[in-house]
From Swiss-Prot:
InterPro entries: Asp/Glu/hydantoin_racemase, Asp/Glu_race, Asp/Glu_racemase_AS_2, Glu_race. It comes from the Bacteria. Substrate binds at residues 12-13, 44-45, 76-77, 188-189. SUPFAM superfamilies: Aspartate/glutamate racemase. Belongs to the aspartate/glutamate racemases family. Its EC number is 5.1.1.3. This is Glutamate racemase. The lineage of its organism: Bacteria, Pseudomonadati, Chlorobiota, Chlorobiia, Chlorobiales. The gene is murI.
């Protein structure tokens, strides 16, 4: 029986989705979060659509064991190619994806109708953000740029490193020349680099953090359905992984700005 006490399930192909956990904890600290990172099969972006949809089904089944009141897809690839699979496997559980949440917020925020999107090679090549944005507002122009080095830079903790800034300037220069007024961070790793990116774009360009966008959407939907946990205690997330990377502890600390890493459970999918 789903109630306000039921957990919120979040899954990603790896550890990038921890930025969604961070955003959820900031906005909804009383919610019990079950996070599953499919670290044994990362990355998803290089897999076929058939395989990605299979993984989406299996990841959802992993979370359904905990009877969640909501499932958040913190993976842009699954958001683009497997949303319907998660919805059907979830059997009526509300499903949110970072892609749609980020696209909707970008459409609301742009003033000049020129939106930039940065993401991994797979996400940009899929054209998923551009399709989602133009489906919402056909008159908007979308300019996309793959930034493949941002993920390793984030995972190495090179957040304010001079080399990172040089790479970011090279990536963003093309988009800035397109007179965009809104920039979507189309990868869940990228919020780690948000401050540096904002320094390069300047204050006049609105940065859309898809992790924050999906957390805000979750808060609204939970409240609308009387499923918001109103407890005053802050809950520690329950972490599940399909393989335990050597750097998981340091990455968790980096992504959540946390001094303590909770126990991590190894699960089979």
């Amino acid at each position: 029986m789903i109630s306000s006490e039921s957990p919120v399930g979040i899954f990603d192909s790896g550890i990038g989705g921890l930025t969604v956990v961070r955003a959820m904890q900031a906005m909804l600290p009383a919610e019990q979060i079950i996070y599953f990172g499919d670290t044994a099969r990362v990355p998803y972006g290089s897999k076929s659509q058939v395989t990605i949809r299979k993984y989406a089904h299996e990841d959802t089944l992993t979370l359904m064991k905990y009877q969640p009141k909501m499932i958040i897809i913190a993976c842009n690839t699954v958001s683009a190619l497997g949303l319907d699979v998660v919805e059907s496997t979830g059997k009526g559980v509300t499903v949110l994806g970072v892609l749609k949440a980020g696209a909707e917020l970008a459409v609301r925020e742009t003033l000049n109708g020129r939106i930039g999107v940065i993401g991994t090679q797979a996400t940009i090549c899929s054209n998923a953000y551009a399709c989602e944005i133009t489906a919402l507002a056909p008159e908007i122009q979308v300019f996309s740029k793959a930034c493949p080095l941002f993920v390793p830079l984030a995972e190495e903790g090179f957040i304010n490193h001079p080399a990172s800034k040089l790479i970011a300037e090279e990536y963003l220069d093309e988009l800035l020349c397109c007179n965009i007024d809104t920039l979507v961070l189309g990868c869940t790793h990228y919020p780690i680099l948000k401050t540096m990116i904002q320094e390069i774009t300047g204050p006049d360009i609105r940065i859309i953090d898809s992790a924050e966008a999906v957390a805000a959407g979750a808060r609204t939907l939970l409240a609308d359905n009387a499923l918001l946990n109103t407890a005053t205690t802050t809950r520690t997330p329950h972490l599940l992984v399909s393989d335990l990377p050597q750097k998981f502890q340091s990455l968790y600390t980096l992504f959540l700005s946390a001094s303590h890493v909770p126990d991590v459970e190894l699960v089979e999918v």
